[in-house]
């Protein structure tokens, strides 16, 4: 039986998500993917509410075995770091309310899993994930967030057997 893993690239305006089907750890197939687009015109609280609602709906419909996020990193702008942290909190809550464990990986770990090098550019990640999963739609310029989400899910598929389950965030 195949497991579904959901990678999420959080954002305050665009949140990319991708679900992969994993069989025997090495057979990885794209299942579904998309973006939650949040209007800049909405107050921040309403954007987080929309993010929570849409991701919760996807979690409910798909029932993934795990959710995977990037570890928090510090932007040059402290406000951006705080806002992104709040978006991550919304995603953690959505997953925890549905009892889906959440794992996190550093961006360079996910890039290394997808491309082979931890300092790969977003374009390199996009190209490699598109080729590995045979999803040409990922090459569109505005699909970088989805490619990052796929990279996170793929990273977990490869590293999950070595994860200490006590390290889950939820």
From Swiss-Prot:
GO terms for biological process: DNA recombination; DNA repair. Its EC number is 3.1.21.10. InterPro entries: RNaseH-like_sf (IPR012337), RNaseH_sf (IPR036397), X-over_junc_endoDNase_Mg_BS (IPR020563), X-over_junc_endoDNase_RuvC (IPR002176). Its cofactor is Mg(2+). GO terms for molecular function: crossover junction DNA endonuclease activity; DNA binding; magnesium ion binding. It catalyses: Endonucleolytic cleavage at a junction such as a reciprocal single-stranded crossover between two homologous DNA duplexes (Holliday junction). Keywords: Cytoplasm, DNA damage, DNA recombination, DNA repair, DNA-binding, Endonuclease, Hydrolase, Magnesium, Metal-binding, Nuclease. The keyword Secreted does not apply. Belongs to the RuvC family. The RuvA-RuvB-RuvC complex processes Holliday junction (HJ) DNA during genetic recombination and DNA repair. Endonuclease that resolves HJ intermediates. Cleaves cruciform DNA by making single-stranded nicks across the HJ at symmetrical positions within the homologous arms, yielding a 5'-phosphate and a 3'-hydroxyl group; requires a central core of homology in the junction. The consensus cleavage sequence is 5'-(A/T)TT(C/G)-3'. Cleavage occurs on the 3'-side of the TT dinucleotide at the point of strand exchange. This is Crossover junction endodeoxyribonuclease RuvC. It comes from Chlamydia trachomatis serovar D (strain ATCC VR-885 / DSM 19411 / UW-3/Cx). The lineage of its organism: Bacteria, Pseudomonadati, Chlamydiota, Chlamydiia, Chlamydiales.
């Amino acid at each position: 039986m195949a497991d579904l893993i959901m990678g999420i690239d959080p954002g305050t305006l665009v949140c990319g998500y991708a679900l992969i089907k994993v069989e025997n750890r090495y057979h990885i197939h794209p299942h579904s993917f998309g973006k939650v687009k949040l209007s800049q015109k909405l107050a921040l609280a309403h954007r987080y509410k929309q993010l929570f609602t849409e991701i919760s709906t996807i979690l409910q419909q798909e029932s993934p075995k795990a959710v995977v996020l990037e570890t928090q990193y510090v932007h040059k702008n402290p406000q951006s770091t705080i806002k992104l942290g709040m978006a991550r909190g919304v995603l953690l809550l959505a997953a925890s309310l549905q009892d889906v464990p959440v794992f996190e990986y550093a961006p360079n770990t996910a890039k290394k899993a997808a491309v082979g090098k931890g300092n790969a550019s977003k374009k390199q990640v996009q190209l490699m994930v598109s080729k590995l999963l045979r999803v040409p739609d990922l090459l569109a310029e505005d699909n970088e967030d989805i490619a990052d989400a796929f990279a996170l899910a793929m990273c977990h598929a490869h590293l999950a057997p070595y994860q200490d389950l006590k390290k889950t965030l939820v």
